[in-house]
Amino acid sequence: MLTLSYQGVDGGFYQCATSLDASLHLEPVVSSVDPNGAFFAFEADLPSVVDPYTLFTEEEVSALVYDSATPLSLSDGDQLTSLLSALAFSDQNQAPVNDGYTYVDGEDTLRVLQGGSVVYHSSGEGRYTAQPGLSGAVEAAWVLANAAAAPLAGQARLYLLSAQADADQKDHYTVIFGYCLNGSAVHLYDDGWAAVFEVTEGVVTDFTIRLRSYSAAPQQALLLPAEKAAAALTALTQDSRELSVQYRDNGDGQAVPYWNAT
């Protein structure tokens, strides 16, 4: 019996002869599996940009629809107190603004806005410190994002969307988180993210967190079979070759699933 391996770096397949007997090892495993029509992209007439080892089925795909909402009410004093406590921010110097409240604590400013955005800026030494390096920046940002957003997110979870070091400014990092629903990313509003943090020289200097809450709706949405979606999806390119189901939340009360190229 031969063992096969695939190296994603160079796209090559490799084989190695073994003393194993297929009738003893492989056949018992596959004997209970019935073919279901699944096939690889390279076996079908699909755009060449599709990853050739993407596995397709001819079945329609269904996914849950989620109700979405802004979970924070500015008229709910308990909610505001809980949020400020989660961010270790004082509520002593509160000032109303057109679309929410501004809290000032020393050289730090926190704005809580009607649409669910929480915006922080420090013009001084900053209250939120981070360990050195990119991993330290991610950890500090995660603690704040999780403390503020996770208790209000319902069935959504936060995940790390990106983390980058600034090429021009030393010790400056940008960390971005997104929401996900049942393992599928949520594209929130126009730019997709749930929270973005700026960390400079071991201090969180700025962040914006968009508070959203998600709960499963009673209906499901039917999506095109993956093969048809691949043929129709113009977003598939050499740099984005894999299909995945994601959710779009435009702020209109529902997060709906759709095919996307990643």
What residues fall within each predicted segment?
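Exposed beta-strand-loop-beta-strand "reactive/processing" segments of non-cytosolic proteins
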Residues: 1, 75-122, 154-201, 209, ...
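Preferential activation on post-signal-peptide N-terminal prodomains/segments
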Residues: 1-136, 143-147
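Helix N-terminus capping/helix-initiation residues
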Residues: 21-22, 183, 225
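Short, non-transmembrane alpha-helical segments in secretory-pathway proteins
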Residues: 75-83, 128-169, 216-254
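C-terminal, well-structured catalytic/ligand-binding subdomain of enzymes
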Residues: 192-228
